[in-house]
Amino acid sequence: MVTSSFPISVAVFALITLQVGTQDSFIAAVYEHAVILPNKTETPVSQEDALNLMNENIDILETAIKQAAEQGARIIVTPEDALYGWKFTRETVFPYLEDIPDPQVNWIPCQDPHRFGHTPVQARLSCLAKDNSIYVLANLGDKKPCNSRDSTCPPNGYFQYNTNVVYNTEGKLVARYHKYHLYSEPQFNVPEKPELVTFNTAFGRFGIFTCFDIFFYDPGVTLVKDFHVDTILFPTAWMNVLPLLTAIEFHSAWAMGMGVNLLVANTHHVSLNMTGSGIYAPNGPKVYHYDMKTELGKLLLSEVDSHPLSSLAYPTAVNWNAYATTIKPFPVQKNTFRGFISRDGFNFTELFENAGNLTVCQKELCCHLSYRMLQKEENEVYVLGAFTGLHGRRRREYWQVCTLLKCKTTNLTTCGRPVETASTRFEMFSLSGTFGTEYVFPEVLLTEIHLSPGKFEVLKDGRLVNKNGSSGPILTVSLFGRWYTKDSLYSSCGTSNSAITYLLIFILLMIIALQNIVML
């Protein structure tokens, strides 16, 4: 179990600060929730049984919300799928859904629970926010009736959406977000387009998206670049994948790369590798939690800056390829070999010596590493790897990755496979790459899945370097680039109304064109 602590003195300080009207910082909370799951069934349960299960989960969330408020938290994020779990069909999830209105309707469900039909879950969540004077983000399912004569309307007459809601300190619904990038969620529909949802508070502007959304330009990058949000609220049901995509590793890197606060609440389910929540700032993690040993939930709190981009403590813009494109490449090793991380083919070269300078390239991406180990463990092998291309089985997202990583064994065929422990410490490392994208996320992961706050930094010229001498034993040091403009076209793992419409139009036009050719 990995947990960084939250000192009570911070809560006291924040309360005093708020009393004198300062809004430069606030206390945030996230809760990692071990979801009480429904019994496995292929037939829908009754609406009453669905509500009973959701209330069991809300009972647990209520305790966390009250504890967070008592410690001075102004806002709390709870996880994706926290009320009922994740394994459903369209039919079996339906009893759990409510009609969630647009926040423009000016609604406090706690005071008017029947205004939009049967909405007991929304009413209870609203009351929890109101009674504890805290902003609450929760994830639940939204259902929207549609006209059966509309070709995009599903057979049951409803669009169904994976949805985040936010209630303010008065219990008012202030934000609603429908997840766009679904991941193996046949129970839900894909919205017509990515929604760009923000809301303002006395302690900053907030944006919202969910889980798999974080890998794409919309909505996340647009919220930061065009809507200038200070903090992202991020509920997720994240399954950890070593070596590059553990929750705490990638989420802390995203916050640093984008220059915003990221409040992450993950579900907790060890058998599915679901754990890893945190409160991340642009200069590193404030608090995080990773626990693969217990089935317990965890409340995390930390003070964060309300407007991190305006703080002098945070770095200025990085030119990610400035250093790598101006230096003379280090000697490219003759023994470069091919290996895989998940399904992605990397070019690797081994770190044979205790210290050195290495370059490994793949197509247009060259990765440069300077390093010095304190002592090279004989039973551990490290490699420098490069990958540029469309990622994974779906081949949707274009990645550019430079990574220093420990191989699972001394057999080079195991390089890129998951490994959780290491003994080798590095006195110095400097990693850079000839990235074609400005969106690069710096990752450092230590033995037993620890982060390394305050032990590394990104220089303005794009180098990821260690600070203050040696680090803990290293699992990975990576620069994870996303080249969004090279992504392939796709539809998410749900039902996209617009995608179906465009496909039908395209087929119709092709038929007309062929008919015209035949007539000629």
UniProtKB/Swiss-Prot annotation:
Molecular function, one GO term: pantetheine hydrolase activity
One GO cellular component term of this record is: plasma membrane
Keyword Hydrolase listed: yes
Short name of any one Pfam family annotated for the protein: CN_hydrolase
GO terms of biological process kind: pantothenate metabolic process
Keywords associated with the record:
Cell membrane, Glycoprotein, GPI-anchor, Hydrolase, Lipoprotein, Membrane, Signal
Q: Where is the CN hydrolase domain?
A: 31-306
Task: State the compartments where it is located.
Answer: Cell membrane
State the lipidation positions (GPI-anchor amidated cysteine): C493
Q: In which tissues is it expressed?
A: Widely expressed with higher expression in spleen and blood.
Q: Does the keyword Membrane apply?
A: yes
Q: How far does the signal peptide extend, from start to end residue?
A: 1-22
Active site residues per record: E80, K179, C211
Tell me the membrane topology, using the record's own terms. Answer: Lipid-anchor; GPI-anchor
Where does the source fall among the domains of life? Eukaryota
Please give the function described in this protein's UniProt entry.
Amidohydrolase that hydrolyzes specifically one of the carboamide linkages in D-pantetheine thus recycling pantothenic acid (vitamin B5) and releasing cysteamine. Involved in the thymus homing of bone marrow cells. May regulate beta-2 integrin-mediated cell adhesion, migration and motility of neutrophil.
| Protein family per UniProt | Belongs to the carbon-nitrogen hydrolase superfamily. BTD/VNN family.
The protein depicted here goes by the name Pantetheine hydrolase VNN2
Q: What organism does this protein naturally occur in?
A: Homo sapiens (Human)
